[in-house]
Curated annotation (Swiss-Prot):
It is found in: Cytoplasm. This is ClpXP adapter protein SpxH. One of its GO terms (cellular component) is cytoplasm. Adapter protein required for efficient degradation of Spx by ClpXP under non-stress conditions. Interaction with Spx stabilizes Spx and exposes the C-terminus of Spx for recognition and proteolysis by ClpXP. InterPro entries: Adapter_SpxH (IPR046404), Thioredoxin-like_sf (IPR036249). The gene is spxH. Its main location: cytoplasm. It comes from the Bacteria. Keywords: Cytoplasm.
């Protein structure tokens, strides 16, 4: 647990390596469990190497198979494919447009909600997405409706009235259309997929489809940065819980590279201090921060 000694996240000034020199795009379907389970990888990568890259979630938006067109590649994607699985577990097809006949469907409404939340900032969008996924996968909500989306907005501490206005707005619709177009251009055929680009280079990007070991993502980041990069110390357990608000023992153990037993001993100490609440859901133990929220970044 040595890595937990750092009390705050202090990003040092850039030296030989360019600050935020890599742009990462995580292509997701919010209703896909695999896209939820990759989040601990992204959190850990951001905590350790966040000074080298920025990240943005791209909502893919599945199209019903009976209405979906075949792929129409508008232009060749300047991207290199690595370790892409030969069989897609979540196959779907795009033509880069929002299908308005799907406007009342759950996938469309959920995608619009994420874009509406993002209009209040990228952090707001990420918080909303995580809260939405908790409802879907922990409380078995298969068809999120408007009422639940508003509850997610409230729980995410974003401006609910602004969210209501944006949910069916032209701005949210345009943002979703841009995500679909970008998904099409990047030839995304499996979710989750992570695409890396160097921000100041015309070199090809790198795409990895599916979920792999954490070391693979670090290796790809190092390849793009093109200089020796070192991980930052991880924040204290309290800082992590304060930022995520709700997280499982399994996720925390992965982030700190410790056993669940060791992590839960530390978490129970926080429970005794009345800083977290233990919640058992579906044979997994979760921890809810019950003090005031504080952002990691």
């Amino acid at each position: 647990m040595d890595k937990q000694e750092a009390k705050h996240i202090n990003m040092p000034s850039p030296s030989a390596c360019e600050y935020k020199s890599v742009e990462a795009y995580l292509f997701i379907d919010p209703l896909c469990k695999d896209c939820w389970e990759i989040e601990p990888f992204i959190i850990k990568l951001w905590l350790e190497y966040g000074k080298y890259f920025s990240i943005r979630h791209i909502v893919t938006g599945k199209v019903d198979g009976t209405n979906a067109s075949s792929h129409k590649w508008n232009k060749p994607a300047n991207i290199r494919f690595v370790w892409e699985k030969t069989t897609s577990l979540h196959g779907f097809s795009y033509d880069g447009k929002v299908h308005m006949q799907e406007a009342s469907s759950t996938p469309y409404l959920v995608s619009m909600a994420i874009k509406a939340a993002e209009l209040q900032g990228r952090k707001a969008g990420s918080k909303f997405l995580r809260k939405l996924q908790e409802y879907i996968f922990l409380e078995n909500v298969s068809n999120p409706d408007c009422e639940l989306l508003l509850a997610c907005a409230k729980d995410s501490d974003i401006d609910v009235e602004e969210f209501k206005k944006d949910l069916y707005s032209a701005s949210a619709k345009k943002a979703f259309q841009c995500d679909l177009k970008f998904t099409n251009e990047m030839h995304i055929t499996e979710i989750p997929s992570l695409v890396f680009f160097h921000a100041n280079s015309d070199e090809e990007g790198i795409k990895i489809a599916g979920t792999y070991s954490y070391d693979v993502y670090v290796q790809l980041l190092k390849e793009l940065v093109k200089c020796e990069i070192e991980p930052e110390p991880l924040p204290s357990l309290e800082v992590l819980l304060e930022a995520t608000q709700f997280i499982s023992s399994k996720e925390v153990a992965f982030i700190y590279d410790c056993s669940k037993q060791e992590i839960e001993r530390e978490l129970k100490k926080l429970q005794l201090k009345r800083k977290v609440q233990m919640i058992d859901v579906k044979c997994e133990r979760y921890w809810k921060w019950i003090a005031k929220e504080k952002d990691l970044v």
